[in-house]
Each structure stands twice: as structure tokens, then as C-alpha cells.
Curated annotation (Swiss-Prot):
It holds the Pfam family FtsL. Belongs to the FtsL family. Part of a complex composed of FtsB, FtsL and FtsQ. It is found in: Cell inner membrane. InterPro entries: Cell_div_FtsL. Residues 1-24 are cytoplasmic. Residues 46-108 are periplasmic. The chain crosses the membrane at residues 25-45. GO terms for cellular component: cell division site; plasma membrane. The keyword ATP-binding does not apply. This is Cell division protein FtsL. Its main location: membrane. It is a single-pass type II membrane protein.
Length: 108
């Protein structure tokens, strides 16, 4: 009996020979399938992260647009001619010069 077991290869050797010998194509295809599945998972994860980042940026853009509109309104209110003129008279004692005191300078 010892002669029979010595002449027969072990089960692990047979499995190894089967996978790397006869089933080499199947092993390569299995590795390719696993790599492809990992690639799909990574691509899906990156897409979800970028979608969340895009939504956050759109929310920030909306907030900044509202702030911009408020600043434009404030600027137009502060730059209104009658307000500037009234403040210059009140705070700086400025007044419009009489037409006879105006001097016109001609440039070449």
C-alpha cells in the first residue's frame, strides 16, 4: 500500500496542475472578471462622490447668486444721484457753483 500512495500524486498537486495547467484560461478569465468588478465598484463610488460634490457646489452657487443680487441692489441704492447730492450738501457743505463761476478748460 505504501507503494500505491507514493506513486499517486497528492490532491493539492492535482488541483494545482489543473488550475495552472489545463485550467489556465479559466483562471485568467476569473481574475479578469474580479478586476472588472472592482473597477465597476470604484467607478460607481467616484461617480457618487462627484455627484454629491456637484450638488454642494450648486447650493453654494445659489447662495452666492443671492448675495450678489443683494450687493448690486445695495450698490445702486448707495450710488443714487439724489442721495449722493443730499449727503454732499449735508455733510460736506458742498453746493453747485453758479454758472458765472464755472471755468471751462479746452484741451487740444
Amino acid at each position: 500500500m505504501s507503494k500505491d500512495t507514493a506513486s499517486q500524486p497528492s490532491l493539492t498537486k492535482l488541483i494545482g496542475l489543473d488550475i495552472f495547467g489545463v485550467g489556465r484560461l479559466h483562471a485568467i478569465l476569473l481574475i479578469c472578471i474580479f478586476l472588472s468588478a472592482i473597477g465597476v465598484v470604484l467607478a460607481t463610488h467616484n461617480t457618487r462622490q462627484m455627484t454629491v460634490q456637484r450638488e454642494n457646489l450648486l447650493l453654494e452657487k445659489d447662495i452666492l447668486d443671492g448675495e450678489w443680487r443683494n450687493l448690486i441692489l445695495e450698490e445702486s441704492a448707495l450710488a443714487e444721484h439724489s442721495r449722493v447730492q443730499a449727503r454732499s450738501v449735508r455733510e460736506l457743505d458742498m453746493e453747485r457753483p453758479a454758472p458765472d463761476k464755472e471755468v471751462i478748460i479746452k484741451l487740444r
